[in-house]
Amino acid sequence: IRQDWLDSLGLEAPRTWDELVKVAEAFVTQDPDGNGEDDTIGILGPSNSDHMNAIGGNQYGLDPLFSSFQSYPQYWLQGEDGTVEYGSIQPETRDALEKISELYTNKLIDPEMLVRSDSKEPLLAGKVGIFFGPWWSGYTVADATLAGAADWQAYFTPLSEDGNYYTHMAEPTTQYVVASKACKNPEAAFKIVNYLIENQQKWVDEGVSTTEMVTSDFYPLYNTYDNADEIEVSYDVLTKYLAGEITMDDVDFSTHKLLKSDMEAVTKLKKEPYDDFSLDKWNLDSDIAKNNLPRLVAILVGDAPSVKEKYVPVYNAYNGQTETMETKW
């Protein structure tokens, strides 16, 4: 959410559905960018190539709006009787769609939702007040952040009527290394992967560019190998490091390939107070800001709600295809 817009209009960050509607309406009708024109978007929506709700991280989707009704389209959910039900056709999804339709009818959601070719365009043009996305959305708004043009802050919103924040969880992985039954030495794949992970940080320290590192010649079996809680660990370490509670000697970098460089950068980029991650509390003019600030903002702003607040995770009960899906879809 554009914190600078909230501040300029004297609004608090929304938590409930009704509060979200109030803020979105203010962003549309009260000229939060101060240009005297009726040209702002309350809530950004997906483009014509994206999804309103998806499995996993869905930037610009409306997933939290569905989840606030405990609706999970495209997910298989275990019902009260133990059977597995498809989330797209549950009553909660109908309820969510009705409320989302109201937002759209009242022009609180992007009028060009699902028609616009690129949802990023109005976002980078400074015309959007709210969008939904994963923690790494800090990279998406990097240009506006580096220019000091927009203070984006992350929130869990909207909460469900019971006061909880529900969120669907992504699949554990979507990338695989596969050895066929004809492979004579399948253990070689494990050895290669272990070697790559073990040496990644050393190569970075030696000056190997990330562009070179992802080529197949340099990095066979390239994949994303990381701890499931990598970002939460990074948030915890960085905030404690800024607070003076730990030093680099207290951190094991062997399985955290970017954490050392993050710690080195954050002390140069963060202004006091060290627990305030507002836009004006960063050294935007630093010569290392361009290469480091987007990631630090993604972690310390984008992942803050996941670390500081409780949420109810909802998992997909079935990740395969049914016979009907195979023949009809």
Q: For each predicted feature, which ranges?
A:
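Active-site-adjacent bridging/hinge elements
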Residues: I1, S68-L77, S101-L108, D162-T174, ...
